[in-house]
Regions:
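Phosphate/nucleotide-binding catalytic core
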Residues: 1-520
Length: 520
């Protein structure tokens, strides 16, 4: 929801006016598709990097606006949490050394953020969910004081008319009620974009759904939330519930939440995907719309489809369809939203290359996959990967196969082939896809965190264990060493200043029920 100037829809007239603009934008998109106005080539890639801002004790630091002012770069923008920022990277054509260029670009931006953070007594950290987060960090006081976030929070709360109920069961179980959408800011991601030829968009979108589970399994990096060991990629469960506009008592009566993996294959056009979203999810906010999109096309101009873009920004499919205009030319993209931030920039670029390689390397045998595979198998794969990461058994071509075997024997060769077809430098392909391959025999981010958390918890309180893990993540990110090369934390690595200890580091939070007649 990138538009800063938004207001809550207040009455029937405003709703009707907004729906009119939405319908006009949908008609305009149909006209552009029929007139062959959508750009087909070159194919470009892009990304958005979200990150946490932490203090010297590795707890969230509520000073994003001060750091943003110090950075003073239009590539950076705010998030709903005042301890998060986002970088919008420049798109690059999919060719030769685009991935290493993207890594260099991202490292340069992060260095800029790091310098600004240091001036504000802060650090920046890449991780899917910050291990040191606690409930006190996700109050409205820590929401970025910008109107659009307050408007969105109020609109979602009004549509629910009750508090948010979060219930996630993994190794541990988390169940809580919360009064705002700030739970959503426990998550940060590395959102990757791939431009898609409009002639093959639906087939490409269905393929992006088919590969989502295996890709997520190797990328998982978010196993802890509030000291609880939950899913390998807990962001999937948390985000789904944290912005759910459905009331708790009516969850069984609605097919899907605003955060979804969808329920079926897509079989028509991208306009129908948008149209389904519009019909399924009511509009929450509005903005100013100066021009009529259909009229613009008739006058030979390209519209930005602002109303449609605003609505799309409040519907959070894990693979989201996107329309954009670059250099005066309209294009279509798929935005991959399920890949977490971190563990390092090198890991993130490897994740992106793996996904892009699979997207452009799809063998002909997987064309029209909606006619061959059961969508429920694909959806099961995705949520199994979110729960179990590299321990997932996938249903692939109607048979069960381990994540490791599927990635090594079929998907990595497929990704190499796709990348070579687009002229990606073999050196770059080898560099980044080897990072993926090495994780199979060692750890992804989630596995590394859990192994250390369990070991540290034998001698430390959970808050101290989380703090130690976060400090080590920060140190290793500074060197940009891929996660597969990270050793487990040793006693020699632990160097947390005692001034950063709190009562909770030594206090037990277990509750025991004792009656007066019980012997102690």
């Amino acid at each position: 929801m990138g538009n800063l100037n938004v207001t809550k829809l207040q009455n029937k007239e405003e709703h009707a006016n907004y729906i009119h603009h939405l319908m006009n934008d949908l008609e305009a998109l149909d006209l552009m598709l029929k007139a062959d106005l959508i750009e087909k080539e070159p194919i470009r890639i892009g990304a958005e990097q979200e990150f946490f801002i932490v203090d010297d004790a590795f707890y969230p630091n509520n000073n994003a606006l001060e750091i943003l002012k110090e950075i003073n770069d239009e590539h950076f923008t705010t998030e709903i949490g005042n301890f998060n920022l986002e970088i919008n990277l420049d798109p690059l054509e999919l060719k030769t050394d685009c991935f290493s260029k993207l890594e260099d670009q991202l490292l340069a931006f992060l260095e800029k953020a790091k310098r600004a953070a240091i001036k504000n007594n802060s650090k920046i950290l890449l991780t899917g969910i910050l291990p040191t987060l606690s409930l006190k960090h996700i109050t409205l006081e820590n929401m970025t004081p910008i109107q659009r976030y307050l408007v969105l929070n109020e609109a979602i709360k009004e549509s629910r008319n009750q508090e948010f109920h979060i219930h996630i069961k993994g190794v541990d179980e988390l169940s809580l009620m919360h009064d705002s959408v700030m739970l959503e800011r426990c998550n940060t991601s590395f959102q990757t974009h791939l431009q898609i030829n409009p002639d093959t968009f639906i087939d490409s979108y269905n393929w992006s759904q088919a590969i989502a589970g295996p890709v997520l399994s190797i990328c998982a990096n978010s196993p802890l939330l509030f000291g609880k060991e939950l899913w390998a990629e807990s962001r999937i469960a948390l985000f789904t519930q944290s912005v759910d506009t459905r009331a708790n008592s009516f969850l069984l009566n609605e097919n899907q939440s605003r955060v979804s993996f969808a329920n079926n294959w897509e079989t028509v056009t991208i306009t129908d995907i948008y149209r389904d979203n519009v019909s399924r999810f009511r509009s929450l906010v509005t903005s100013d719309y100066i021009t009529n999109s259909v009229d613009m096309i008739e006058r030979g101009k390209i519209p930005k489809l602002k109303a449609l873009g605003l609505h799309n920004g409040t519907v959070y499919r894990w693979n989201r369809v996107c329309y954009g205009v670059g250099n005066g030319k309209p294009h279509l993209r798929i935005e991959n939203r399920y890949i977490p931030s971190g563990p390092t920039v090198a890991d993130e670029i490897a994740n992106m290359m793996f996904w892009v390689g699979l997207m452009v390397g799809k063998p002909e045998t997987y064309n029209n996959i909606h006619e061959k595979w059961d969508f429920k198998d694909v959806k099961t794969n995705f949520f199994s990967a979110a729960r179990y990461g590299m321990g997932t058994q996938f249903i692939w071509n109607g048979k069960y196969i381990s994540s490791q075997q599927l990635i090594l024997e079929e998907l990595l060769p497929m990704a190499y082939k796709g990348l070579y077809c687009y002229g990606i430098n073999p050196t770059d392909a080898e560099k980044y896809l080897t990072i993926i391959e090495n994780r199979v025999s060692t750890n992804n981010g989630s596995q590394w965190i859990i192994k250390n958390y369990r070991e540290l918890s034998k001698t430390k309180r959970k808050f101290e264990a989380a703090q130690i893990i976060t400090s080590q993540m920060y140190k290793k990110q500074e060197h940009n060493y891929p996660i597969a090369s990270w050793n487990l934390i040793s006693e020699n690595d632990i160097n947390i200043n005692s001034s950063h200890f709190y009562v909770k580091h030594v206090m037990s939070t277990d509750i025991f029920l004792v009656k007066k007649e019980d012997s102690l």
